[in-house]
């Protein structure tokens, strides 16, 4: 089980979704059961990816549920989101309703492959932000914006980035659900990135601030051909 105090999520998406949005929500600590990660298709796919064994346990968990949600969007709604809403009923509302519509109408999506450039990019940004004790942002402490970082790591075509901040024991699955809900985010940019059929590659990094709070970065890219 896990306890969640605060989640802050931000998004910056190139090509399709331009601009920034952010939302901060504070929750009373509540215990939530952690579902088993036992989908063989997702596990086999993930474990075959180059760079997978370099991920931390939290990063592997986040990667699992991201790909599970793309392979089984309807099941993700029923088996993951709904049980969470029972614990946090304050999450009910228009965003939950639209998420249900989106997850039940979307067809099965391609599972994300790990990309070395995106892994390095996500890890570098998460590390730079936390080591500098900087506020969660898509702009690095040295002033580099997402577009610059994307290009500097040898990536091209379209791409995007989701970031999330969690205080206390920030659970990867909870952070993902909050990104999907996109409460107070008018353009639903996080959700659109996660369900974007053009995005086929990802890189994930979760780093800790000195106070133990977590900063998550997930970068995306289209085909690099």
Language-model regions, residue ranges each:
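Bacterial Sec-dependent N-terminal signal peptides
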Residues: 1-24
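Helix-centric, low-specificity signal for extended rod-like, repetitive segments
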Residues: 13, 63-64, 184
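N-terminal low-complexity, Pro/Thr/Ser-rich intrinsically disordered segments
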Residues: 24-60
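Acidic/histidine-rich, surface-exposed loop or edge segments in extracytoplasmic proteins
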Residues: 39-52, 99-107, 157-161
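Calcium-binding acidic motifs and repeat modules
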Residues: 51, 223-224
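Short, well-ordered surface patches within globular domains
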Residues: 52-153, 197
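A well-ordered secondary-structure block
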Residues: 124-223
């Amino acid at each position: 089980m896990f306890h969640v105090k605060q989640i802050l999520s931000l998004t910056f998406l190139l090509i399709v979704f331009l601009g920034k949005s952010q939302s901060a929500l504070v929750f009373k600590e509540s215990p939530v059961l952690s579902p088993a990660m036992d989908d063989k298709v997702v596990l086999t796919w993930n474990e075959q990816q180059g760079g997978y064994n370099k991920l931390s346990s939290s990063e592997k968990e986040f990667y699992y549920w991201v790909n599970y949600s793309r392979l089984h969007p309807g099941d993700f709604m029923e088996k993951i989101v709904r049980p969470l809403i029972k614990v946090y009923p304050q999450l009910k509302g228009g965003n939950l309703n639209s998420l249900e519509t989106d997850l039940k109408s979307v067809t099965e999506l391609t599972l994300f492959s790990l990309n070395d450039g995106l892994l390095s990019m996500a890890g570098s940004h998460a590390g730079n932000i936390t080591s500098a004790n900087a506020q969660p942002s898509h702009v690095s402490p040295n002033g580099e914006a997402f577009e610059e970082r994307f290009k500097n790591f040898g990536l091209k075509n379209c791409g995007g980035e989701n970031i999330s901040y969690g205080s206390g024991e920030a659970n990867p699955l909870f952070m993902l659900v909050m990104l999907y809900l996109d409460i107070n985010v008018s353009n639903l940019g996080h959700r659109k990135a996660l369900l974007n059929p053009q995005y086929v590659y990802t890189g994930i990094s979760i780093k800790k601030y000195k106070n133990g709070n977590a900063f998550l970065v997930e970068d995306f890219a289209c085909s690099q051909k």
